[in-house]
Amino acid sequence: MKSSLHWFLISSSLALPLSLNFSAFAAVVEINLGPTNSFSGPGTYTPPAQTTNADGTIYNLTGDVSITNAGSPTALTASCFKETTGNLSFQGHGYQFLLQNIDAGANCTFTNTAANKLLSFSGFSYLSLIQTTNATTGTGAIKSTGACSIQSNYSCYFGQNFSNDNGGALQGSSISLSLNPNLTFAKNKATQKGGALYSTGGITINNTLNSASFSENTAANNGGAIYTEASSFISSNKAISFINNSVTATSATGGAIYCSSTSAPKPVLTLSDNGELNFIGNTAITSGGAIYTDNLVLSSGGPTLFKNNSAIDTAAPLGGAIAIADSGSLSLSALGGDITFEGNTVVKGASSSQTTTRNSINIGNTNAKIVQLRASQGNTIYFYDPITTSITAALSDALNLNGPDLAGNPAYQGTIVFSGEKLSEAEAAEADNLKSTIQQPLTLAGGQLSLKSGVTLVAKSFSQSPGSTLLMDAGTTLETADGITINNLVLNVDSLKETKKATLKATQASQTVTLSGSLSLVDPSGNVYEDVSWNNPQVFSCLTLTADDPANIHITDLAADPLEKNPIHWGYQGNWALSWQEDTATKSKAATLTWTKTGYNPNPERRGTLVANTLWGSFVDVRSIQQLVATKVRQSQETRGIWCEGISNFFHKDSTKINKGFRHISAGYVVGATTTLASDNLITAAFCQLFGKDRDHFINKNRASAYAASLHLQHLATLSSPSLLRYLPGSESEQPVLFDAQISYIYSKNTMKTYYTQAPKGESSWYNDGCALELASSLPHTALSHEGLFHAYFPFIKVEASYIHQDSFKERNTTLVRSFDSGDLINVSVPIGITFERFSRNERASYEATVIYVADVYRKNPDCTTALLINNTSWKTTGTNLSRQAGIGRAGIFYAFSPNLEVTSNLSMEIRGSSRSYNADLGGKFQF
């Protein structure tokens, strides 16, 4: 079936039996292959005739072709396709070419024996060669005496092919794999070199648009997946991986890739600009678990990982991940992503008594060196496994860590990390798992060099350019034969322990250790000072400088006081003091840091502002209940009845620099009854239950169950209208005036969960309760023209006072338990507004719109005192401060189905400077 994914346009020619087409203008032979050339054994398969055209042979696919089980039960006596004189080309034109279970005896499936000629495959939607060789005598799936090219095919798969010589899948004087979106080499095998690819020339793998994978390929000698003796390039691939490839023979090297030559010039293996690059689980005998090469240039274009690769030897395994040959060179540049070495090992000894040691890279003997070790800003090279070297005498070739490309250019500003943090406890007890050696003078040109978790870095000498940073954990060591000059040393506060020190050590006679600038302290995690131990004075013997004579240790240009890199931090606040002691017996000077607490600045995770802000949630709820009752009384056409309403509230407060934003949502029901006390007095009682949620824009969530009760009294009076009011539409000389008074009580039970990032989830329970009082007066006017938009209007003014109380409580189920004292919210406001109403013709329905301006004339913002019980450190937790002015818009509808049954619905919105709230209700009333 023709693939729907066409990498090239399909030829318009019809599928024909095997035929020859000769061009009148060229001597190239073109042969069509179509579905009729497919074969499925067992049975007798006759391969196409061997071609011998000096100007080349092209096979054009006119449809999908599948050849399976050819050579069964009797092996073929020749290759399926063979050219002896010219180029041999296969052009897919968007079709599939599938070959599987081919037995060609000692022959390859595809062969070009012509010297300096090309064997190529291009334009296939799917090119697949699976088990296309004899399992014991086969010599590879594709073999070309000249170059081999696989280009511009949508998907290529080479699996389980075998060579009794070199190159289980491909062999050529050079190999190019380019512009293939999907490329897979799996479980190919060679009894000599190159389990998947073999070339004495260069190999290029580039522009793989999706992924390229080399997995479980095996060679006996060198290059479990790839063997080459010339400079080769693996570049600009979206993702490429080498997983579980291996070599098996004694002294075999390069578990995944071998790129080396005995003759000059020595080849360079270049891995550059790959969006993702992985070497995982590859194994070599002797050297280079993943890569063995003379010269390696690795420049990351994305995340690059060397993990769990290993070199195994009874005597001296070298390079768990990478082995650089004698006189070779290494360049590592983390430019487009991090480069990480983790879990790579060398395994030494007989199988019954093997020892495993962490190792990332081994630099060979005879002047082998590192020429570049650098990372761009925002990128890091992680050495969780040490670097070793076979060189016994240090080189004079300097290595500029993060050095520029050219003299005069700016230095790189990324980070280079040597760390033991990925070691198990047993591994960390072995010094060789922590010690990296670079037998060259080191200069830190820019960015940061970080020594973490007990590692030791050994070099010929070490110096530091201005603007760069050396970060050391307590317990790490920088050791040189020659001198050490440091102008910006930073210690990790989180690593300080009474028995561990950072060490700067010069081992040869008359060499100096010079420390200048400031000794700085940094908290990389941002959480160190939250530990309760900082509540007490602390003394740390943190740094030792060692030389052959204390006189060669220079600290005269070092600032007297340490410098905190992040003086504004969460947790305990305090001051650091630095002192020095000289020890002539150990020929060293030791630094001591003393900590004195001065205060506490709580982490935003512990401030608990949502607790105080739940008072605003209760405030919103009780005020919405009061508004519902007042609206219900005004909309009622009769004076006696029972009613029920569903109610919902939504309140949102934006974040500010001081307070996290939060939101409150609640919904429930209100039931009430209205009756008359006297001819001019109306009384309403209501009960409400609400279910609410509160959450801040952080780590706190609260659930609340609220109960409320309200009592509303309305009195109608008639007053003589002031002369000014008589000019208003609908005014009369005797003006009716409504006086309303309402009091409400609310009780809310809260259950809050705090999802700490560094501690177990905390849980809290408490209650809020409070009351609200409302006094209002309105002037109903009903004589507007019935031709207008509204028929009546009601100007009004109110005074509202609310008091909400939060009970004290203690947190539970977490490590650093907090307590919260009680807190209060008081708010007094004066709303002024007007309601417009329109009636239906039969007055069974009405519609109303209300606009209100609210001024909060007095407020006590919610706050409470919060404390950590473990040390009784406390701080003030404040709730948000709403804008003192608000605008409210409200719309409502009333409909009477009968004299005894009414339905009402209202929607309102309140806008403040940095908050907004919405309220909706729907219900009915039964009158009697």
Curated annotation (Swiss-Prot):
Alphabetized UniProt keyword annotations: Cell outer membrane, Cell wall, Membrane, Secreted, Signal, Transmembrane, Transmembrane beta strand
Where in the cell does this protein reside? Answer: Secreted, Cell wall; Cell outer membrane
Domain Autotransporter span(s) in chain numbering: 635-928
Signal peptide segment: 1-26
Q: What topology in the membrane does the UniProt record assign?
A: Peripheral membrane protein
Which InterPro entries does the UniProt entry name for this protein? Answer: Autotransporte_beta (IPR005546), Autotransporte_beta_dom_sf (IPR036709), Polymorphic_membr_middle (IPR011427), POMP_repeat (IPR003368)
Instruction: Say yes or no: keyword Membrane present.
Output: yes
Q: Which GO terms describe its cellular component?
A: cell outer membrane; extracellular region
Q: Does the keyword Transmembrane apply?
A: yes
NCBIfam families (alphabetical): POMP_repeat
Family in the record: Belongs to the PMP outer membrane protein family.
The protein's name:
Probable outer membrane protein pmp9
Q: What is the organism of origin for this protein?
A: Chlamydia pneumoniae (Chlamydophila pneumoniae)
